[in-house]
Amino acid sequence: MTNKLTSFLADRKKTIENQLSVYTEKLDMPDSLKKSMLYSLQAGGKRLRPLIVLAVLNAYGKSEKDGIPVGCAVEMIHTYSLIHDDLPCMDDDDLRRGKPTNHKVFGEATAVLAGDGLLTESFKLITSHVSDEVSAEKRLRLVNELISAAGTEGMVGGQVADMEAENRQVTLEELESIHERKTAKLLGFCVIAGAILADAPEEDIETLRTFSSHIGIGFQIRDDILDLEGSEEKIGKRVGSDTTNDKSTYPSLLSLEGAKHKLDVHIKEAKRLIGGLSLQKDLLYELCDLIAARDH
């Protein structure tokens, strides 16, 4: 990473993490529920999703202030999905980001409800915590985009399709369809949300939608690669869990080298799409490289 990207990520990450805690601390709820929600929100992580929202605003030369609550909303949804993914009825993981998973600390029932709370409260950040400069129409568009990305047409539907694909061989087309919904759509929302807040032209938004699909699939391919050759200490969870759970992955379908080539193809296409837009490209190019080369 260049000094520019390192500085950008470090400065904004602190802001995002602080605001996630502030938003949640202010909510009126049972103490046990608040502790469970904060436990997972404060467990670390890349904060890549909110940082993408801010990076797109930055690329258009616009203020990042309204990107913070919108980015935090996405991070809350991402965190809820991790809590639920780790449950015994799903992936049955005991470790997340180097710490015991939420249900191991607070019990399954509280973990489920903490996830429910994070999902529900996330939308309030968009409707009530952005500035008055963001019109009601724009807020509604953001909410609708987020519902499509996180709900049955996106992440939730993708998770079900992923579960149904276990213990059987799927085609590459099926695998990409699963991860387009399970992973790429929520990452894609971050790109689109930044563009909407920046008042980007509709033509740009459609190009960015395709761009986000490529980085989303690329992100998943890198995840699959790390599950084979990553460091458990850096990843913060068990390595090899995809194989243990008999999941189809890009390396299992294409070989490890084939998956790395596929990742390279997606990242190059994402950069090509950005190259045709009238915005500051350097930061987005570097984010593409970060997605392709990350070690956790």
Curated annotation (Swiss-Prot):
Cellular component annotations (GO), alphabetically ordered: cytoplasm
Ligand binding (Mg(2+) 1): 85, 91
Binding-site residues, Mg(2+) 2: 85, 91
EC number: 2.5.1.10
Binding site for isopentenyl diphosphate: 46, 49, 78, 97
Top-level taxon in the UniProt lineage: Bacteria
GO MF annotation: an example: prenyltransferase activity
Reaction catalyzed: isopentenyl diphosphate + (2E)-geranyl diphosphate = (2E,6E)-farnesyl diphosphate + diphosphate
Keyword line: Cytoplasm, Isoprene biosynthesis, Magnesium, Metal-binding, Transferase
Localization in the cell: Cytoplasm
Name used for this protein in its record: Farnesyl diphosphate synthase
Natural source organism: Bacillus subtilis (strain 168)
Name of the gene: ispA
